[in-house]
């Protein structure tokens, strides 16, 4: 199982999530995405996309703004991190990529049965096919219908 916590704005979240999906497909692993609603990207994943994997929404809008959601988000992160055989922080991911490239990172992921990865960038090379799974949600299609037709 690969658990990804994509960070740092919508673009970086899409890079992290898309590359984690590609790695999960390559390794035949289940993917779980810890989607953070935060000041820079305060939107639920299901409001944007119809995704083919499990998404767990957590809030990082601060204790003063959303105390219950903030506490729940912290509990969910602890729960899922505890399930992992290994936890990689953003800096760990970048250090592995710098030293060993994407192949080195893939080897680390492949070695662990359950890995929790916090990342603000891609975990592998991406191409247009890597993003093909991103389908707009019904709400986005409805709102964008005048633009799409």
List PLM regions with ranges.
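A short beta-strand-loop structural module common to alpha/beta enzyme folds
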Residues: 29-40
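Histidine-anchored nucleotide/phosphate-binding helix
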Residues: 14-25
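Secretory-pathway luminal glycosyltransferase catalytic domains
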Residues: 41-149
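A short, glycine/small-residue-rich beta-strand->loop->alpha-helix junction that serves as a flexible
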Residues: 6-15
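Extreme N-terminal starter segment of soluble prokaryotic enzymes
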Residues: 1-2
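Structural alpha-beta junctions
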Residues: 25-30, 53-56
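Short, flexible loop/turn elements at secondary-structure junctions
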Residues: 8-9, 37, 121
